[in-house]
């Protein structure tokens, strides 16, 4: 599969639901990370927001991927406190806006464009720079890796796996950083040695996307095999 690979709304929905489950599974860990440099509520806030987002999708299924991601973002802004709601919410809203009201099927390149737009939303909202010890430090390298892999004619599943690995590397790199944004920045040098919880959540987001793409690829392969005489 190349950049022309089709990506349906169902793949985006699976991504969101995967992310909600990963957040729920890691809720305590994320709050423990936040306890060291923040308010100790990042995990509970994100879990509440993603549960609300899934409930909103269940109540009124969006007609396309753009509307789906926008609904997730709007829900996060309205239900998640602190900086996480506006940042993750803006990211999803910008992603949805990038996809627009296109019909059910998109291309792999649209996924990369959506994540690039989401990164732009994070930059506009939070004004982070590389090395500030924020979600940017996991998201930016993930988007770069995704684009590079797709440019090399990789499948979406392969490209998102590369993005997942880059996000994890970026997440881990926040541990020795000095925080320069948000509540963690008030700690000064005491913020060094602690992983940024926002970056940890971004790594889960990209992991969820990689899993959704891999599942979709497996489903497509199975359907093709079944159709073979």
Give, region by region, the residue ranges found by the protein language model.
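N-terminal loops that bind phosphate or other acidic moieties
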Residues: 1-229
């Amino acid at each position: 599969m190349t950049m022309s690979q089709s990506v349906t709304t169902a793949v985006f929905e699976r991504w969101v639901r995967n992310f909600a489950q990963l957040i729920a599974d890691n809720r305590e860990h994320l709050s423990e990370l936040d306890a060291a440099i923040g308010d100790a509520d990042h995990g509970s806030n994100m879990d509440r927001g993603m549960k609300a987002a899934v409930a909103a999708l269940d109540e009124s299924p969006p007609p396309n991927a753009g509307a789906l991601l926008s609904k997730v973002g709007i829900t996060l802004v309205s239900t998640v406190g602190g900086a996480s709601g506006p940042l993750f919410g803006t990211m999803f809203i910008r992603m949805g806006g990038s996809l627009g009201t296109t019909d059910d099927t998109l291309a792999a390149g649209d996924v990369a464009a959506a994540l690039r737009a989401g990164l732009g939303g994070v930059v506009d909202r939070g004004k982070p720079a590389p090395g500030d010890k924020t979600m940017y430090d996991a998201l930016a390298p993930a988007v770069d890796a995704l684009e590079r892999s797709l440019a090399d004619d990789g499948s979406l599943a392969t490209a998102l796996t590369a993005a997942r690995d880059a996000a994890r590397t970026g997440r881990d790199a926040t541990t020795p950083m000095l925080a320069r944004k948000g509540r963690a920045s008030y700690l000064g040098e005491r913020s060094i040695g602690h992983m940024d919880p926002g970056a940890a959540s971004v790594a889960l987001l990209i992991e969820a996307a990689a899993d959704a793409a891999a599942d979709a690829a497996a489903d497509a392969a199975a359907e093709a095999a079944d159709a073979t005489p």
